[in-house]
Regions:
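Active-site helix-to-loop segments that bind/position phosphate- or nucleotide-bearing substrates
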Residues: 1-168
């Protein structure tokens, strides 16, 4: 659909604002059962599930960055002196759909997801071991993030020119 068209048209710095258009389209369609869903930290459920899931993902990515010899504070696109995880926030972007998919699964299997129950937390804590495809191989998400952060280090050091991302 239109997301693929926008993806092909994105230029450096995104002067045509394709990312924002794609995000609006994505959120409108991923939770289409929820009328007028708006993604936001303080928003209505399932924002609570997304917030928790992204916090877990961020921790996994920050750990991988440190293990690769990088500082999670020094971001590429994200810059904020009050955010100690700017680089983690940059690197985690291509992994967000894995969290989104898990949240959808939780929503389908749970009648009430307005609160983070013990059962829901247990499901969210599976994020590090979610099946991920990277380099045409299946591996746990935490291993895939290690491959991504290692490739970023190699880009910074001049050993390679492209980062390794998960396939969706």
């Amino acid at each position: 659909g239109c997301m693929y068209v926008w993806a092909d048209k994105v230029r450096s710095g995104d002067p045509d604002n394709f990312e924002a258009r794609a995000a609006a389209y994505y959120w409108k369609n991923i939770f289409s059962d929820i009328p007028n869903f708006v993604r936001g930290r303080e928003g209505e459920p399932p924002n609570n599930l997304l917030n928790s899931g992204y916090a877990i993902l961020r921790a996994v990515v920050a750990r991988s960055l440190v293990a690769s010899g990088l500082l999670p504070t020094l971001g590429i696109h994200h810059h904020n002196k009050y955010n100690a995880y700017c680089l983690a926030d940059d690197v985690m972007e291509p992994y967000r759909p894995y969290v989104d998919g898990l949240v959808l699964d939780i929503m389908e299997s749970t009648y009430d997801y307005s609160e983070l129950t013990k059962e829901i937390k247990m499901k969210l804590l599976a994020i590090p071991v979610l099946d991920t495809t990277i380099g045409n191989k299946k591996s746990p998400l935490m291993i895939a993030t290690q491959q991504t952060t290692s490739s970023l280090y190699k880009c910074f050091s001049g050993e390679q020119r492209r980062m390794v991302y998960p396939e969706l």
